[in-house]
Amino acid sequence: VTVNDNHVLVTLADGTSFTLPKGETYTFDIANRDYTLFSSNETRTYLLTTANIDDATLIAIPQGWTAVLNDKDLRITAPAVSGDDVKDGELKILVTPSKAFGKVIKMQLRAVREAHFLTFEDVDYKGDANMVGERNWSSLIDSQQYGGPLLYPKNNQLYNWSDANNSFLASELPKGWGDYQYWGGGHAISNYLDMDLTHGDFQHQLAVYYQDAKTGFGGHNGSKNFCVHYGYADNSGYANGPLPYIYFGDGVARVVDHMYVTMTTYLANCVANGNGLTAPAGKDDWVKLVAIG
């Protein structure tokens, strides 16, 4: 292999050779590009991060949608949607780098009459005072992952949360072992992350096995906060009582369109190494996620 400033020359054992042009590293990032569910007539602006790009052009916009692309951002407006209708389609952007092959960026857009997002980020908190008297999500993160005062209270205060005035989703600890504590299951707000599988145990039960490369946080798309589910039904002897669940606190039926899920460090360690209750996952094993509404 011979490399110069512009090409890579590859010579095979039989003497055959071919030349590959050298490309230049380039960047075309759309911030929050996974958030593509819109409410009727909603306009959303996505900030762009670019480097070594000659041109970026919108080459496909779904019918009824509008989109404007410039050097700094992408602005998308959804069509009008009524009733239970759904307007969806694929938006495409042709990106032409300075010294590399171009590529097509795709975004799957979807619009419904009304959409709300539960992010667990403090800036998105819209409810009244929570169980500890604060108007944010972070105050619901326990100071200890196991045995903390919020999830394992010494008084009768029941751990609960509600996304009032937004998605209206809510949850509280079930009576798993008769005492409404997290060892009986529940949905706990967290911002813990841990990439060390030797910490994959109940002492680190609120940590996710994921860290965003840009923000250093453990939530989806680089966000800081998230919700940790704990609770199961099997014959191990360690499951008892009702399973935890999330519901609409105002009693109105709605559709949960999607959610983003990752493994906790506890689960990742069980899959990789096993523990006292389960063997490590083999090549023919699988992990199945089922959501019932």
Predicted features, each with a name:
Residues G251-H258, W286:
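Extended extracellular/luminal ectodomain segments enriched in beta-structured repeat modules
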Residues N4-N6, T16, G23-Q63, V112-R113:
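Solvent-exposed, low-complexity, repeat-rich "mucin-like" stalks and linkers
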Residues E114-L243, G251:
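N-terminal targeting leaders for non-cytosolic proteins
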Residues D85-K99, L289-G293:
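A short beta-strand micro-motif common to beta-rich folds, especially ectodomain repeats
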Residues C270-L289:
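Short coil-to-beta strand junction motifs in C2/discoidin
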Residues D73-E90:
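Extracellular/luminal low-complexity segments enriched in Ser/Thr/Pro
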Residues G23, A100-A115:
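C-terminal edge beta-strand
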Residues A13, P79, L94-A100:
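Beta-strand-rich extracellular modules
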